[in-house]
Structure formats: C-alpha cells, structure tokens
Amino acid sequence: MQIDEKQKIFEEIFAPKSGEKVLVLVDIPHNDILDNEAWKKRREMAKEWYESFKEMGKKTGFTVDFKKYNATGLQNTLIPKDILDKISDANLIIAMTEYSGSSSLITLCNKKGSNTRIASMPKVEKRMEKTAIKANYSEVNSYANSIKKMLTKANGAEIIFSTGDTLFIDLRNRKGKSDKGDCSKKGQFINFPSGEGFIAPYEGAADEIKKFGESKTKGILPDNQHGKLIKYRVEKNKIVDVIGNSKKAEERRRFFSKNDTRRNIAELGIGCNPRAVVTGNILEDEKVGGLHIAYGSSNYLGGKTKSDLHNDICFPKGLPAEVKTLTLMNKDNSKIELIRNSRLRYEIL
C-alpha cells in the first residue's frame, strides 16, 4: 500500500489532528519469549506506518513517536503499569503487537477525562492492507451497529454447530457493543481491522445472581484452534470439562486448571467485514461474517469476569466445526436467525 493510500485510511479511521501526539507501539521478544518471522514483519510494518504518520504529521501538525515494550507472552494478559503510564499522554495509540494488550490498553480510554483513543492491532499482517483494512468502513459501521442492537434486544443465543453440538448462551442483563472502525474521538477504543458486533454473556456474578439467577449458558463448545478439534462441556457460563482423553485434551485441562477464571465464556461476537478473509489469523478471522466465542476476561467488554487472558475461538466456513445456525431469542419471544447455513445474513442487517 502506497503512502497516500495509507494516509487516506489514517484520515478516515483515526483522523489525527493538529497539536496531537500519535504513538505507534510494538512489543518485542525477550528472554524465553522468542521472535518469529511474522513478528519481525509486523515490526517492519509498524515502522512503515510510523513513517507514513510522520509524513502526514508534517502537513497536519501532529507529532509522532515510536515505542517498544517487552512482550507479555499471553494474549490479553496485563501490560505493566509503568508501561501504561509512559504512553498515557498520547492522543492516538496504534498498537501493532504480537500479544494483544487490549484489556489493559482500553483502561487508558476509559479513564475519566481521557484524551486517548486507541487502535489495537494484535498479530496484524501487511497483507491485510489489501483485505480487511481496505474495507468500506461506512458499510462496516452500519452492519456492526445493526448487530449491536440485535444483541442488546436478545435474551439468549441458540447455536447449532456442524459437529451436531449445540450451545445456548445467556445474554440477559447485558448490552451489545460494536467495533465499527471509528477511532477519531477521544476515549474510543477499536480492534483494527474492525468489523464486529459483540456482547459479554451473563455470568451470574455475585452482585446480580440474586435478581437474575444463575447463568443459563450451557452446552458443548467446539474449539478449532489447537491443530485438532477439541470440545468443551459448558455449564452456568463456565467450561467445566474438556471432553476426551487425548494428549491435547489433557493439555487443555491443565491450561484451564492454572486459573479458574479462564473457564468463563467471555464473548459472543459476530464478524461483519465483507473484505475480511480466513487465514488462521484471529485478528482478521473474527471479522469474517460469522461467529466467534471467547473465554477468559469479559470485564472490559461489559461483563463481570477479570482473568489473565482473553482467547477467541472462530468458526469460519471450512473448519472442522462450523456454525450451521445462530438464532437470537428476543425479550419479546420473537426469534432472529442471524447465521444460516454457516453464513451471516447481511441482508437483514
């Protein structure tokens, strides 16, 4: 992508203004957190974006900085406070990292009186400049807002997977949110490339269980992300068991036993970026028209659970576990089949 093309996207999505401070942020390998080729290329891409922002800043009147920090080693684990303090004076932060820092970075945007807006781009790849990054974001905005409204009106979601498994996700007492590709105003936080509507499921936390009862989230959750298909048994919005006795199943049991909060069903997300393609990269896969479900932290999405990570499972067409149908059960007892035959129904958005 040429500099002028980048700058057009920067203006549309980020709208940096005269007098502002723009920061391009990367994480770096250290100690036993080893480098890899994709990570190296991402840091090169970050440098290219930094240079493009600098050229744009000369004309517009904003300044640009480039900062590095030692990688955390886990997706959405906490970034140390001293790092957050050092970057908190930036007006616009572009975080092009190996390990997602979204759950920490969003706290800078949520602070009272915050002047910071952030685009989190974990595992971004340069090829995305030709796919999801180049989407028509006015169109994406419209789709994401429609999904947000649908999720807010729903009490639950019934999901049928191609494996024959079913899962009900409790959406009571929660509000839908959208990631629509707008990072132009202070306090805004986006995942970029963007394009999804999402909601944190109802967990039945201590401060709400008396009024709303236990979570009704229950069923079998397939996981495509670990080389072979794994299935989790879910009850009351928690992963209570990993099905099977394979080596991979035992590994997953140990993973969840390290921190009980990892068991929390943290997100139901619906991707809606027509330019996104499936390649195995979660950042873009979850923006493809379809479903993703996450476990771990939900507190920064409107839920109640804080964990040491937030991991997404995507269900695009072509993987061992697809979503055949996803039906929203509304508060007025009506139903909306949002995904049919493994395809998001863009025509109803």
Regions flagged by a language model, labelled:
Residues M1-I220, Q225-G227, T327-L349:
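Active-site bordering "gate/hinge" segments
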Residues D241-K304:
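Dual-mode signal for accessory low-complexity, basic/Gly-rich regions
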Residues G19, K218, L229, K236, ...:
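Active-site lining segments that contact anionic ligands and/or coordinate catalytic metals
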Residues K211-G213, D223-N224, K231-R233, K258-D260, ...:
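Short, conserved, surface-exposed binding loops centered on an aromatic residue
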Residues T163, S215, R262, D285-K287, ...:
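A short, structural micro-pattern
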Residues K218-R254:
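Long, well-ordered mid-to-C-terminal structural blocks that present hydrophobic/aromatic surfaces
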